């Protein structure tokens, strides 16, 4: 969080480059050591790790709100803002499928995760539907959720809550902005958090009394 605040505090290219170098010097050795340690822990224990990977939990009558690239510390910042507005909030984590890229982790964050599987022959790390050669792309996932009676919601159009099976909303541009802006994404965090807050408020106004916010991966 201190690194994000430092990067967000400067605007001039020279200042940004200086802060980036400092952050890199401090964090890169730790990140590298952490990644290698994690690899060592799972080496030879892939089946045990796979068994610990779970999809997003979902309660009846609740809306699952997928926020792309909502890194854990940024999720903590969102939780603080939600609490400040009087919402009851609980922050938790789960083990994501590997590799933690959108094509792998996002499908398991959906309400269709129980129908998905991996495999050595999958393409571009994209899981497929069980007993099917079909990759779990965005449209097939939405079609499957719709067949279960899930309300599929748009970012801007917020219809009133329809059924009691649950809802699904995709929102957030942290991942997209990160690819475009690089380290300058830090200056956009506040704006993106406010957008997520507005989405939560809109869902509540539409009749959703419980919202679970999930994501696919973080970023460096």
Regions found by a protein language model. Give the residues of each.
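…; additionally, a secondary subgroup of soluble metalloenzymes is captured
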Residues: 1-63, 69-220
């Amino acid at each position: 969080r201190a690194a994000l605040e430092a990067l967000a505090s400067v605007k001039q290219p020279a200042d940004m480059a200086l802060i980036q170098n400092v952050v890199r010097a401090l964090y890169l050795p730790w990140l590298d050591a952490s990644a290698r340690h994690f690899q060592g822990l799972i080496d030879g224990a892939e089946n045990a790790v796979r068994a610990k990977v779970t999809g997003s939990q979902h309660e009846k009558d609740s809306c699952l709100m997928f926020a792309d690239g909502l890194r854990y510390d940024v999720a903590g910042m969102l939780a603080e803002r939600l609490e400040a507005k009087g919402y009851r909030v609980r922050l938790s984590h789960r083990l994501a499928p590997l590799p933690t890229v959108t094509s792998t982790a996002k499908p398991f964050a959906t309400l269709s995760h129980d129908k998905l599987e991996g495999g050595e022959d999958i393409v571009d790390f994209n899981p497929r539907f069980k007993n099917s050669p079909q990759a779990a792309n965005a449209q097939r996932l939405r079609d499957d959720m719709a067949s279960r009676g899930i309300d599929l919601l748009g970012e801007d159009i917020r219809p009133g809550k329809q059924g009691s099976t649950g809802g699904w909303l995709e929102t957030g541009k942290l991942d997209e902005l990160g690819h475009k802006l690089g380290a300058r994404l830090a200056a956009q965090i506040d704006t993106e958090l406010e957008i997520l807050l507005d989405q939560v408020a809109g869902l509540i106004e539409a009749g959703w009394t419980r919202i679970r916010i999930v994501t696919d991966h973080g970023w460096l």
